[in-house]
Protein backbone atom coordinates (compact mmCIF):
# COMPACT_ATOMS: atom_id res chain seq x y z
CA UNK A 1 0.00 0.00 0.00
CA UNK A 2 1.63 3.14 -1.20
CA UNK A 3 0.59 6.47 0.27
CA UNK A 4 2.23 8.49 -2.49
CA UNK A 5 5.01 11.04 -2.05
CA UNK A 6 4.98 11.97 1.63
CA UNK A 7 7.28 14.94 1.04
CA UNK A 8 4.37 16.78 -0.58
CA UNK A 9 2.75 16.87 2.86
CA UNK A 10 5.67 18.79 4.34
CA UNK A 11 5.26 22.57 4.75
CA UNK A 12 8.72 23.28 3.39
CA UNK A 13 8.27 21.32 0.13
CA UNK A 14 8.61 23.73 -2.84
CA UNK A 15 5.97 21.99 -4.96
CA UNK A 16 3.05 22.48 -2.57
CA UNK A 17 0.36 24.88 -3.72
CA UNK A 18 0.84 27.26 -0.83
CA UNK A 19 4.59 27.57 -1.38
CA UNK A 20 4.11 28.02 -5.14
CA UNK A 21 1.66 30.84 -4.45
CA UNK A 22 4.09 32.53 -2.06
CA UNK A 23 6.88 32.36 -4.64
CA UNK A 24 4.62 33.77 -7.34
CA UNK A 25 3.53 36.69 -5.14
CA UNK A 26 7.14 37.49 -4.25
CA UNK A 27 8.10 37.45 -7.91
CA UNK A 28 5.22 39.77 -8.78
CA UNK A 29 6.21 42.18 -6.02
CA UNK A 30 9.83 42.18 -7.14
CA UNK A 31 8.74 42.82 -10.74
CA UNK A 32 6.55 45.76 -9.67
CA UNK A 33 9.42 47.30 -7.69
CA UNK A 34 11.75 46.86 -10.62
CA UNK A 35 9.27 48.62 -12.92
CA UNK A 36 8.89 51.52 -10.48
CA UNK A 37 12.66 51.91 -10.23
CA UNK A 38 12.98 51.90 -14.00
CA UNK A 39 10.22 54.53 -14.30
CA UNK A 40 11.93 56.77 -11.74
CA UNK A 41 15.26 56.40 -13.47
CA UNK A 42 13.68 57.28 -16.79
CA UNK A 43 12.04 60.39 -15.28
CA UNK A 44 15.36 61.44 -13.76
CA UNK A 45 17.11 61.04 -17.08
CA UNK A 46 14.45 63.10 -18.84
CA UNK A 47 14.65 65.81 -16.17
CA UNK A 48 18.43 65.98 -16.44
CA UNK A 49 18.19 66.21 -20.21
CA UNK A 50 15.69 69.08 -19.89
CA UNK A 51 17.93 70.87 -17.39
CA UNK A 52 20.91 70.52 -19.70
CA UNK A 53 18.92 71.89 -22.62
CA UNK A 54 17.64 74.76 -20.46
CA UNK A 55 21.15 75.57 -19.26
CA UNK A 56 22.51 75.47 -22.80
CA UNK A 57 19.68 77.81 -23.97
CA UNK A 58 20.42 80.22 -21.11
CA UNK A 59 24.13 80.20 -21.91
CA UNK A 60 23.45 80.88 -25.56
CA UNK A 61 20.96 83.66 -24.65
CA UNK A 62 17.92 82.20 -26.37
CA UNK A 63 16.02 81.98 -23.08
CA UNK A 64 16.15 84.15 -19.99
CA UNK A 65 17.95 82.75 -17.01
CA UNK A 66 15.51 80.93 -14.78
CA UNK A 67 15.66 80.82 -11.01
CA UNK A 68 15.78 77.64 -9.01
CA UNK A 69 12.58 75.73 -8.50
CA UNK A 70 12.17 76.43 -4.78
CA UNK A 71 13.37 80.05 -4.77
CA UNK A 72 9.82 81.37 -5.14
CA UNK A 73 9.15 80.12 -1.57
CA UNK A 74 11.82 82.46 -0.22
CA UNK A 75 10.97 85.55 -2.18
CA UNK A 76 10.18 88.70 -0.22
CA UNK A 77 12.15 90.35 2.56
CA UNK A 78 13.68 87.07 3.73
CA UNK A 79 14.59 86.02 0.23
CA UNK A 80 17.02 88.90 -0.23
CA UNK A 81 19.34 87.69 2.57
CA UNK A 82 22.87 86.97 1.39
CA UNK A 83 24.23 84.01 3.31
CA UNK A 84 27.79 84.91 2.57
CA UNK A 85 27.35 88.22 4.36
CA UNK A 86 25.80 86.38 7.27
CA UNK A 87 28.89 84.19 7.44
CA UNK A 88 31.02 87.32 7.45
CA UNK A 89 29.39 88.38 10.72
CA UNK A 90 26.87 90.98 9.58
CA UNK A 91 23.54 90.99 11.46
CA UNK A 92 20.86 89.53 9.24
CA UNK A 93 17.89 91.26 10.86
CA UNK A 94 19.33 94.69 10.36
CA UNK A 95 20.16 93.90 6.76
CA UNK A 96 16.65 92.63 6.12
CA UNK A 97 15.11 95.78 7.55
CA UNK A 98 17.38 97.95 5.46
CA UNK A 99 16.36 96.07 2.34
CA UNK A 100 12.70 96.45 3.25
CA UNK A 101 13.13 100.21 3.73
CA UNK A 102 14.87 100.47 0.37
CA UNK A 103 12.11 98.55 -1.40
CA UNK A 104 9.24 100.50 0.24
CA UNK A 105 9.57 103.21 -2.38
CA UNK A 106 8.76 100.89 -5.29
CA UNK A 107 6.99 97.61 -4.73
CA UNK A 108 7.78 94.76 -7.10
CA UNK A 109 7.16 91.07 -7.46
CA UNK A 110 10.73 90.38 -6.31
CA UNK A 111 10.06 91.69 -2.81
CA UNK A 112 6.70 89.95 -2.56
CA UNK A 113 4.97 93.20 -1.59
CA UNK A 114 3.08 93.53 -4.89
CA UNK A 115 -0.65 92.73 -4.55
CA UNK A 116 -1.49 89.36 -6.05
CA UNK A 117 2.14 88.24 -6.20
CA UNK A 118 1.29 85.10 -4.23
CA UNK A 119 -1.18 84.00 -6.94
CA UNK A 120 1.07 84.91 -9.85
CA UNK A 121 2.00 82.02 -12.19
CA UNK A 122 5.36 80.47 -11.41
CA UNK A 123 6.48 79.07 -14.76
CA UNK A 124 6.47 75.46 -15.88
CA UNK A 125 5.31 74.02 -12.54
CA UNK A 126 2.11 76.05 -12.59
CA UNK A 127 1.45 74.98 -16.18
CA UNK A 128 1.94 71.32 -15.26
CA UNK A 129 -0.35 71.71 -12.27
CA UNK A 130 -2.99 73.34 -14.45
CA UNK A 131 -2.74 70.58 -17.03
CA UNK A 132 -3.12 67.88 -14.36
CA UNK A 133 -6.13 69.69 -12.89
CA UNK A 134 -7.78 69.92 -16.30
CA UNK A 135 -7.15 66.22 -16.94
CA UNK A 136 -8.67 65.27 -13.58
CA UNK A 137 -11.71 67.54 -14.00
CA UNK A 138 -14.91 65.39 -14.21
CA UNK A 139 -16.60 67.82 -16.61
CA UNK A 140 -13.61 67.63 -18.90
CA UNK A 141 -13.80 63.82 -18.80
CA UNK A 142 -17.54 63.89 -19.62
CA UNK A 143 -16.97 66.23 -22.56
CA UNK A 144 -14.12 64.09 -23.78
CA UNK A 145 -16.37 61.00 -23.71
CA UNK A 146 -19.09 62.89 -25.58
CA UNK A 147 -16.62 63.92 -28.27
CA UNK A 148 -15.41 60.33 -28.59
CA UNK A 149 -18.99 59.08 -29.02
CA UNK A 150 -19.68 61.75 -31.62
CA UNK A 151 -16.54 60.76 -33.47
CA UNK A 152 -17.61 57.10 -33.37
CA UNK A 153 -21.05 57.97 -34.74
CA UNK A 154 -19.54 60.10 -37.51
CA UNK A 155 -17.14 57.34 -38.46
CA UNK A 156 -19.95 54.74 -38.50
CA UNK A 157 -21.71 54.90 -41.92
CA UNK A 158 -24.72 52.78 -40.82
CA UNK A 159 -25.59 55.11 -37.95
CA UNK A 160 -25.06 58.16 -40.12
CA UNK A 161 -27.46 56.73 -42.70
CA UNK A 162 -30.11 56.15 -40.02
CA UNK A 163 -29.68 59.69 -38.69
CA UNK A 164 -30.06 61.11 -42.20
CA UNK A 165 -33.23 59.08 -42.76
CA UNK A 166 -34.70 60.31 -39.47
CA UNK A 167 -33.87 63.92 -40.33
CA UNK A 168 -35.42 63.53 -43.77
CA UNK A 169 -38.60 62.01 -42.27
CA UNK A 170 -38.91 64.86 -39.77
CA UNK A 171 -38.47 67.44 -42.55
CA UNK A 172 -41.11 65.69 -44.68
CA UNK A 173 -43.54 65.67 -41.75
CA UNK A 174 -43.02 69.39 -41.21
CA UNK A 175 -43.60 70.11 -44.90
CA UNK A 176 -46.80 68.01 -44.93
CA UNK A 177 -48.05 69.83 -41.86
CA UNK A 178 -47.37 73.21 -43.47
CA UNK A 179 -49.19 72.15 -46.66
CA UNK A 180 -52.22 70.98 -44.66
CA UNK A 181 -52.36 74.27 -42.76
CA UNK A 182 -52.15 76.22 -46.04
CA UNK A 183 -54.98 74.13 -47.54
CA UNK A 184 -57.16 74.70 -44.48
CA UNK A 185 -56.55 78.46 -44.61
CA UNK A 186 -57.33 78.51 -48.35
CA UNK A 187 -60.58 76.56 -47.81
CA UNK A 188 -61.64 78.89 -44.98
CA UNK A 189 -60.92 81.93 -47.13
CA UNK A 190 -62.88 80.42 -50.05
CA UNK A 191 -65.83 79.57 -47.80
CA UNK A 192 -65.90 83.08 -46.35
CA UNK A 193 -65.71 84.76 -49.75
CA UNK A 194 -68.43 82.49 -51.22
CA UNK A 195 -70.74 83.07 -48.23
CA UNK A 196 -70.22 86.84 -48.44
CA UNK A 197 -70.92 86.81 -52.21
CA UNK A 198 -74.04 84.71 -51.65
CA UNK A 199 -75.35 87.02 -48.93
CA UNK A 200 -74.67 90.11 -51.07
CA UNK A 201 -76.47 88.56 -54.07
CA UNK A 202 -79.42 87.60 -51.84
CA UNK A 203 -79.56 91.15 -50.46
CA UNK A 204 -79.50 92.67 -53.96
CA UNK A 205 -82.16 90.24 -55.19
CA UNK A 206 -84.44 90.96 -52.22
CA UNK A 207 -83.90 94.73 -52.58
CA UNK A 208 -84.74 94.62 -56.32
CA UNK A 209 -87.83 92.52 -55.68
CA UNK A 210 -89.05 94.90 -52.96
CA UNK A 211 -88.51 97.91 -55.26
CA UNK A 212 -90.51 96.23 -58.05
CA UNK A 213 -93.35 95.51 -55.63
CA UNK A 214 -93.29 99.07 -54.38
CA UNK A 215 -93.48 100.39 -57.96
CA UNK A 216 -96.40 98.07 -58.88
CA UNK A 217 -98.50 98.65 -55.72
CA UNK A 218 -101.00 101.56 -55.16
CA UNK A 219 -100.87 103.55 -58.43
CA UNK A 220 -103.30 106.26 -57.21
CA UNK A 221 -102.37 106.82 -53.54
CA UNK A 222 -99.12 106.36 -51.64
CA UNK A 223 -97.74 107.04 -48.18
CA UNK A 224 -95.43 109.88 -47.35
CA UNK A 225 -92.23 108.35 -45.91
CA UNK A 226 -92.17 108.52 -42.12
CA UNK A 227 -95.67 109.84 -41.37
CA UNK A 228 -98.04 107.11 -42.57
CA UNK A 229 -100.17 109.61 -44.56
CA UNK A 230 -101.55 109.08 -48.04
CA UNK A 231 -101.09 111.64 -50.84
CA UNK A 232 -101.74 111.57 -54.55
CA UNK A 233 -99.19 110.31 -57.04
CA UNK A 234 -98.98 113.75 -58.61
CA UNK A 235 -97.61 115.15 -55.34
CA UNK A 236 -95.25 112.24 -55.04
CA UNK A 237 -93.96 112.69 -58.59
CA UNK A 238 -93.36 116.36 -57.90
CA UNK A 239 -91.34 115.37 -54.82
CA UNK A 240 -89.33 112.86 -56.85
CA UNK A 241 -88.59 115.33 -59.66
CA UNK A 242 -86.77 117.84 -57.47
CA UNK A 243 -84.24 116.83 -54.79
CA UNK A 244 -85.55 118.14 -51.45
CA UNK A 245 -83.56 118.80 -48.35
CA UNK A 246 -84.45 117.34 -44.97
CA UNK A 247 -86.18 120.56 -43.79
CA UNK A 248 -88.24 120.81 -47.01
CA UNK A 249 -89.29 117.16 -46.61
CA UNK A 250 -90.36 117.83 -43.03
CA UNK A 251 -92.36 120.87 -44.08
CA UNK A 252 -93.95 118.96 -46.94
CA UNK A 253 -94.89 116.11 -44.57
CA UNK A 254 -96.40 118.53 -42.04
CA UNK A 255 -98.48 120.19 -44.81
CA UNK A 256 -99.82 116.81 -45.91
CA UNK A 257 -100.53 115.93 -42.29
CA UNK A 258 -102.60 119.12 -41.75
CA UNK A 259 -104.36 118.59 -45.10
CA UNK A 260 -105.31 115.03 -44.11
CA UNK A 261 -106.63 116.25 -40.74
CA UNK A 262 -108.83 118.88 -42.35
CA UNK A 263 -110.10 116.40 -44.90
CA UNK A 264 -110.90 113.76 -42.24
CA UNK A 265 -114.06 115.69 -41.23
CA UNK A 266 -115.87 114.53 -44.39
CA UNK A 267 -117.19 110.98 -43.72
CA UNK A 268 -117.53 109.55 -47.27
CA UNK A 269 -113.94 110.41 -48.23
CA UNK A 270 -112.63 108.94 -44.94
CA UNK A 271 -114.53 105.73 -45.58
CA UNK A 272 -113.11 105.41 -49.08
CA UNK A 273 -109.60 105.94 -47.72
CA UNK A 274 -110.17 103.28 -45.07
CA UNK A 275 -111.42 100.76 -47.63
CA UNK A 276 -108.45 101.35 -49.92
CA UNK A 277 -106.09 101.03 -46.96
CA UNK A 278 -107.62 97.69 -45.92
CA UNK A 279 -107.43 96.38 -49.49
CA UNK A 280 -103.77 97.34 -49.74
CA UNK A 281 -103.01 95.68 -46.37
CA UNK A 282 -104.75 92.46 -47.50
CA UNK A 283 -102.74 92.37 -50.71
CA UNK A 284 -99.54 92.88 -48.75
CA UNK A 285 -100.42 90.09 -46.31
CA UNK A 286 -101.17 87.65 -49.10
CA UNK A 287 -97.87 88.54 -50.77
CA UNK A 288 -95.94 88.16 -47.50
CA UNK A 289 -97.59 84.76 -46.84
CA UNK A 290 -96.65 83.55 -50.32
CA UNK A 291 -93.14 84.79 -49.78
CA UNK A 292 -92.94 82.91 -46.45
CA UNK A 293 -94.05 79.64 -48.07
CA UNK A 294 -91.50 80.05 -50.85
CA UNK A 295 -88.47 81.08 -48.79
CA UNK A 296 -87.02 78.43 -46.41
CA UNK A 297 -85.23 80.95 -44.13
CA UNK A 298 -87.37 84.04 -43.54
CA UNK A 299 -85.47 85.30 -40.50
CA UNK A 300 -82.16 85.43 -42.33
CA UNK A 301 -83.73 87.17 -45.32
CA UNK A 302 -85.35 89.72 -43.04
CA UNK A 303 -82.04 90.41 -41.29
CA UNK A 304 -80.25 90.73 -44.63
CA UNK A 305 -82.96 93.14 -45.84
CA UNK A 306 -82.60 95.23 -42.70
CA UNK A 307 -78.82 95.36 -43.14
CA UNK A 308 -79.30 96.22 -46.80
CA UNK A 309 -81.63 99.04 -45.84
CA UNK A 310 -79.15 100.40 -43.30
CA UNK A 311 -76.34 100.41 -45.85
CA UNK A 312 -78.71 101.75 -48.52
CA UNK A 313 -79.18 104.96 -46.53
CA UNK A 314 -75.52 105.85 -47.02
CA UNK A 315 -75.31 104.62 -50.63
CA UNK A 316 -78.20 106.37 -52.40
CA UNK A 317 -80.73 108.94 -51.12
CA UNK A 318 -83.56 107.71 -53.41
CA UNK A 319 -87.07 108.33 -51.94
CA UNK A 320 -88.27 104.83 -52.90
CA UNK A 321 -85.71 103.21 -50.61
CA UNK A 322 -86.58 105.62 -47.81
CA UNK A 323 -90.24 104.66 -48.09
CA UNK A 324 -89.27 100.98 -47.95
CA UNK A 325 -87.01 101.56 -44.95
CA UNK A 326 -89.57 103.53 -42.97
CA UNK A 327 -92.34 101.01 -43.65
CA UNK A 328 -90.36 97.93 -42.62
CA UNK A 329 -88.34 99.08 -39.63
CA UNK A 330 -86.79 96.39 -37.34
CA UNK A 331 -89.51 96.92 -34.69
CA UNK A 332 -92.35 96.89 -37.23
CA UNK A 333 -95.21 94.40 -36.55
CA UNK A 334 -98.25 94.27 -38.81
CA UNK A 335 -101.75 93.56 -37.54
CA UNK A 336 -103.32 90.25 -38.56
CA UNK A 337 -106.73 90.18 -40.22
CA UNK A 338 -109.75 88.31 -38.85
CA UNK A 339 -109.41 85.54 -41.44
CA UNK A 340 -105.77 84.92 -40.55
CA UNK A 341 -106.55 84.91 -36.84
CA UNK A 342 -109.33 82.37 -37.40
CA UNK A 343 -107.08 80.19 -39.53
CA UNK A 344 -104.30 80.24 -36.92
CA UNK A 345 -106.77 79.42 -34.16
CA UNK A 346 -108.02 76.42 -36.17
CA UNK A 347 -104.43 75.24 -36.68
CA UNK A 348 -103.71 75.50 -32.95
CA UNK A 349 -106.86 73.56 -32.10
CA UNK A 350 -105.97 70.83 -34.59
CA UNK A 351 -102.46 70.63 -33.15
CA UNK A 352 -103.83 70.31 -29.60
CA UNK A 353 -106.24 67.60 -30.76
CA UNK A 354 -103.41 65.69 -32.40
CA UNK A 355 -101.29 65.95 -29.24
CA UNK A 356 -104.14 64.63 -27.13
CA UNK A 357 -104.61 61.67 -29.48
CA UNK A 358 -100.90 60.90 -29.30
CA UNK A 359 -100.97 60.98 -25.49
CA UNK A 360 -103.95 58.60 -25.39
CA UNK A 361 -102.23 56.20 -27.78
CA UNK A 362 -99.09 56.16 -25.62
CA UNK A 363 -101.13 55.48 -22.47
CA UNK A 364 -102.97 52.62 -24.20
CA UNK A 365 -99.69 51.10 -25.36
CA UNK A 366 -98.24 51.22 -21.82
CA UNK A 367 -101.39 49.63 -20.40
CA UNK A 368 -101.15 46.80 -22.95
CA UNK A 369 -97.51 46.19 -22.03
CA UNK A 370 -98.34 45.99 -18.34
CA UNK A 371 -101.17 43.52 -19.01
CA UNK A 372 -98.87 41.31 -21.07
CA UNK A 373 -96.23 41.31 -18.29
CA UNK A 374 -98.81 40.34 -15.68
CA UNK A 375 -100.07 37.51 -17.91
CA UNK A 376 -96.53 36.18 -18.33
CA UNK A 377 -95.93 36.28 -14.58
CA UNK A 378 -99.08 34.24 -13.97
CA UNK A 379 -97.99 31.62 -16.52
CA UNK A 380 -94.56 31.36 -14.89
CA UNK A 381 -96.09 30.76 -11.47
CA UNK A 382 -98.20 27.90 -12.88
CA UNK A 383 -95.35 26.11 -14.69
CA UNK A 384 -93.11 25.95 -11.61
CA UNK A 385 -90.78 28.73 -12.69
CA UNK A 386 -91.45 30.56 -9.43
CA UNK A 387 -88.59 28.52 -7.92
CA UNK A 388 -86.14 30.19 -10.29
CA UNK A 389 -87.34 33.59 -9.12
CA UNK A 390 -86.95 32.54 -5.48
CA UNK A 391 -83.39 31.39 -6.20
CA UNK A 392 -82.53 34.73 -7.73
CA UNK A 393 -83.96 36.55 -4.70
CA UNK A 394 -81.97 34.39 -2.26
CA UNK A 395 -78.76 34.84 -4.29
CA UNK A 396 -79.19 38.60 -4.30
CA UNK A 397 -79.75 38.76 -0.52
CA UNK A 398 -77.12 36.18 0.59
CA UNK A 399 -73.42 37.01 1.13
CA UNK A 400 -70.13 35.16 0.57
CA UNK A 401 -69.92 34.22 4.25
CA UNK A 402 -73.32 32.48 4.12
CA UNK A 403 -72.31 30.47 1.06
CA UNK A 404 -69.02 29.36 2.69
CA UNK A 405 -70.84 28.30 5.85
CA UNK A 406 -73.37 26.32 3.82
CA UNK A 407 -70.58 24.38 2.02
CA UNK A 408 -68.31 23.91 5.05
CA UNK A 409 -69.08 20.20 5.30
CA UNK A 410 -67.51 19.56 1.88
CA UNK A 411 -64.23 21.40 2.51
CA UNK A 412 -62.56 18.62 4.61
CA UNK A 413 -64.19 15.20 4.94
CA UNK A 414 -61.49 12.67 5.94
CA UNK A 415 -57.89 12.56 7.13
CA UNK A 416 -56.79 11.91 3.55
CA UNK A 417 -57.97 15.40 2.62
CA UNK A 418 -55.22 16.87 4.82
CA UNK A 419 -52.55 15.44 2.51
CA UNK A 420 -54.18 16.78 -0.66
CA UNK A 421 -53.78 20.26 -2.06
CA UNK A 422 -56.64 22.36 -0.75
CA UNK A 423 -56.70 24.41 -3.97
CA UNK A 424 -57.70 21.36 -6.04
CA UNK A 425 -61.28 20.15 -5.90
Swiss-Prot record:
The lineage of its organism: Eukaryota, Metazoa, Chordata, Craniata, Vertebrata. Pfam families: Cir_N, CWC25. It is found in: Nucleus. Residues 20-70, 333-377 form a coiled coil. Identified in the spliceosome C complex. Its main location: nucleus. The modification Phosphoserine is found at residues 170, 218, 222. Keywords: Coiled coil, Isopeptide bond, mRNA processing, mRNA splicing, Nucleus, Phosphoprotein, Spliceosome, Ubl conjugation. GO terms for biological process: mRNA splicing, via spliceosome. It comes from Homo sapiens. There is a cross-link at residue 391 (Glycyl lysine isopeptide (Lys-Gly) (interchain with G-Cter in SUMO2)). Involved in pre-mRNA splicing as component of the spliceosome. One of its GO terms (cellular component) is nucleus. This is Pre-mRNA-splicing factor CWC25 homolog. Belongs to the CWC25 family. SMART domains: Cir_N. Residues 146-343 are annotated as: Disordered. Residues 175-193, 251-274, 284-306 have a biased composition (Basic residues).
